[in-house]
Amino acid sequence: MSYKENLNPSSYTSKFATPSSATAAQRVLRKEPYVSTFTTPSDNLLAQRAQLARITPSASSSVPGRVAVSMDASSQNTALAELPKRKFTIDDFDIGRPLGKGKFGNVYLARDKQNKFIMALKVLFKSQLEKEGVEHQLRREIEIQSHLRHPNILRMYNYFHDRKRIYLMLEFAPRGELYKELQKHGRFDEQRSATFMEELADALQYCHERKVIHRDIKPENLLMGYKGELKIADFGWSVHAPSLRRRTMCGTLDYLPPEMIEGKTHDEKVDLWCAGVLCFEFLVGMPPFDSPSHTETHRRIVNVDLKFPPFLSDGSKDLISKLLRYHPPQRLPLKGVMEHPWVKANSRRVLPPVFQSSSK
């Protein structure tokens, strides 16, 4: 569960709201974005600059949930270095407005009282985790995400717990959820889609070189950072699988590759399929195998029944077709995605790739 994934923010009545009812794995339409009573120009400034700023009290900070920012790169770097080492309790934080609400808990804007560093604090209820039997999944998510360092992967700084709750200290992504951005615009143009694809491919290549398979790439699990860059934000279905081939079915139906639907073993190439589905959805506004029934969706996926609308360019269709191959070894490698002519011609990526590997 990413801090903005499958979250329907609700009104803020207490520091810790109650968990929402279970949501199905199949995608559902969201409610309108939460509009906080604390939304002010200061909050907007915060959203634009939080990743690069040291948070300090302002004249408006007497209102709960309201903070202002002043730039201090040195203080930010010091705070980042300290976060993984310190032991925390909930009393170490000023709790701001809620960012979202999910099946197992809630997410809040939070500020470390000691160094004024701002983050997203995900609060998970142990009773709900135990009820659903997903404690092992959370442990795996923490183990994986806390060790990843990439500009297109949401940072997990630390975690702590008390008798009733588990708290995940996450990077705050000021521009919010990519899925809502896609809903707002209907579909993305080629430049934005290609930029996201380059960022995604670079982040996934970083993961795969570390034997991490994500297995649940979709718009709901992606956030946008300070410059609008893509951030992979949910590692709930990821696995750290050195030399293992998996059989577990997971993820969202529209994004499942043929080998998972058919119950076959799978490896990191499931992420290549998901990248192809994602690219199609960026450009078209809906997944490529979307159908009225689950049965029909399954049929279209296993037959790779891929139909392109006429407005797609030849370059984008070529990339998608090379990713959506039935046989996993035939799918375009991530290095090939980043070097694809359509991506190179259209991507406007700002951050340089931080991970270079030899081609496989």
From Swiss-Prot:
Record's function text: Serine/threonine-protein kinase component of the chromosomal passenger complex (CPC), a complex that acts as a key regulator of mitosis. The CPC complex has essential functions at the centromere in ensuring correct chromosome alignment and segregation and is required for chromatin-induced microtubule stabilization and spindle assembly. Involved in the bipolar attachment of spindle microtubules to kinetochores and is a key regulator for the onset of cytokinesis during mitosis. Required for central/midzone spindle assembly and cleavage furrow formation.
Protein name from the UniProt record: Aurora kinase B
Gene Ontology annotations for the cellular component aspect, listed alphabetically: chromatin; chromosome; chromosome passenger complex; chromosome, centromeric region; cytoplasm; kinetochore; midbody; nucleus
Name of encoding gene: aurkb
UniProt GO BP: cellular response to UV; cleavage furrow formation; midbody abscission; mitotic cytokinesis checkpoint signaling; mitotic sister chromatid biorientation; mitotic spindle midzone assembly; negative regulation of B cell apoptotic process; negative regulation of cytokinesis
Positions of the Protein kinase domain: 93-343
List of catalytic residues: 216 (proton acceptor)
Binding residues annotated for ATP, in chain numbering: 99-107, 122
Upper lineage: Eukaryota, Metazoa, Chordata, Craniata, Vertebrata
Keyword Zinc: no
Localisation: Nucleus; Chromosome; Chromosome, Centromere; Cytoplasm, Cytoskeleton, Spindle
Record-stated family: Belongs to the protein kinase superfamily. Ser/Thr protein kinase family. Aurora subfamily.
Enzyme Commission number(s) from the entry: 2.7.11.1
Keyword annotations from UniProtKB, A to Z: ATP-binding, Cell cycle, Cell division, Centromere, Chromosome, Chromosome partition, Cytoplasm, Cytoskeleton, Kinase, Mitosis, Nucleotide-binding, Nucleus, Phosphoprotein, Serine/threonine-protein kinase, Transferase
Reactions catalysed: L-seryl-[protein] + ATP = O-phospho-L-seryl-[protein] + ADP + H(+); L-threonyl-[protein] + ATP = O-phospho-L-threonyl-[protein] + ADP + H(+)
Domain of life: Eukaryota
Record GO terms (molecular function): ATP binding; histone H3S10 kinase activity; protein serine kinase activity; protein serine/threonine kinase activity
Organism of provenance: Xenopus tropicalis
Quaternary state and interactors: Component of the chromosomal passenger complex (CPC).
Enzyme class per UniProt: transferase
Keyword Nucleus attributed: yes
